[in-house]
C-alpha cells in the first residue's frame, strides 16, 4: 500500500525593501505583497483564475492575516519565478484543485509576517510595546492604557518605510480559526464586477510586441487523423502567414497563423479538412452506456467488503424505489476560448 499526503509548503519570505515610483514609495514586503505609501495594498496572485475562485479565495487568505478588507486589495498576476511554485506539484502550475491547499500556509504567512513588521514599526514610532498595538482595516491602532496616543492609528502606508528596514520575523504565528473575520465567511467575488462589465483581462487579451495569432482546428472525434487538407483556399487570405499540420500524440490538427485573431478565425472557417477515422472514432454515448451495463451485469468482481443482508432488507422493505440515471460525458473545459501565449526568443 502506498499513500501520498500533501504537506503544507514552506517558502522563504524575503523583505524586498522600498522603491520610489514617481511620487509614491512602494514596499515589497515579500514576493506576494506590496504596500504603497498611499496605503494601497497590492497582492501578487501566483495561481490562475479560471472561474474556480482563486482570485477571491487567495486574496482572502492574505487579507485575513494582514487585517485588511479583501475588497480593497489590488490583485495582479505573478510572473514566472520559482518562489511561486505549487508546493504539491513542485512547479508553477494551477490545477487539481490545489491552489488553496498548496498556498494556505504560505499566503497567510506572507500577510501575517507583514502585519507583525507593521505593528513593530508603529510600536517603535509611539515608543510602546508591540503587545499594546493591534492591526485593523489597514492601520495599526495604539491600545496602550497609559499612553497619550491611545486610540490613535497609523496607516500601513505611513509605516511601510519603517517596516521595510526590518528583517522578516522567524516566528510567524497565524490566527486561530475562531478569530477568522473573512476566511469561511460570505465574501463577494472580487472579480465579479469586472467580468460582468467586460473590463476583466483574460488570457486571450494578451498583447505582446510583434505578436502573431494562431487558431488550431482539431479533429472532430477522438483518435481521428488528418487524411488531407486544402490550404490553397486560405493561405492567400489577408494576414495569413502560415498554415501547417500538427501530428503529435497530444495534438492532431491544422494550425493557422495570422497577424490578427480575426484573420486566423476567418481562415479557419474557410478551411477544408478530410479526417481519417479509426475504431475509436465510432465510440459514442450509446456504445459507452452499453458497455457500462454489460460491465455492471458481470458479478465476477472481487467483493472486498460486505456488511448486512441487502437481499433480505429489500425483500422485507415496505416500499422499494428503483431508478436508473444516465449522465452524458461532460468536458472539463472553460466557457471562454481556450488559449495561451508564448514568447519565443532566440536565446
Annotate each language-model stretch with its function.
Residues 1-347:
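Structural alpha/beta core scaffold segments of enzyme domains
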